[in-house]
Amino acid sequence: PTQTQLLANYPNPFNPETWIPFQLAQDSTVTAKIYDITGKQIKMIELGHIPAGNYVEVNKAIYWGGRTGDGEQVSSGTYFYQIEAGDYTETRKMVILK
């Protein structure tokens, strides 16, 4: 890919799991964070240092099973997901419908 980019999660809305696809223009240390509607971080997913490429398919995209870092199932509502890859940061919205 020519640019690093955070793509729309799928499915959206979802219940209880979703995948968060992204593209990396260069090798980067990647972290994904999930926030609730109030802006509180509820989950962090550290992917470590990964090579440039497309992480779009189910077996490559970031997986989130709808649980907090403490393992609690989250309730229906709007959440935000953010990816940090080197100097790149992007945030998008997703919805859980139960």
Stretches with model-predicted labels:
Residues 88-92:
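Extracellular and select intracellular beta-sandwich modules with Ser/Thr-enriched
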Residues 1-10, 14-38, 44-48:
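Glycine-centered coil/turn sites that cap beta-strands in beta-rich domains
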Residues 34-38, 68, 85, 96-98:
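Residue-level signal for short segments within beta-strands and strand-turn junctions
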Residues 46-86:
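Short, surface-exposed loop/turn motifs with a glycine/proline- and acidic-biased composition
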Residues 48-49, 94-98:
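Short beta-strand edge segments in extracellular beta-sheet folds
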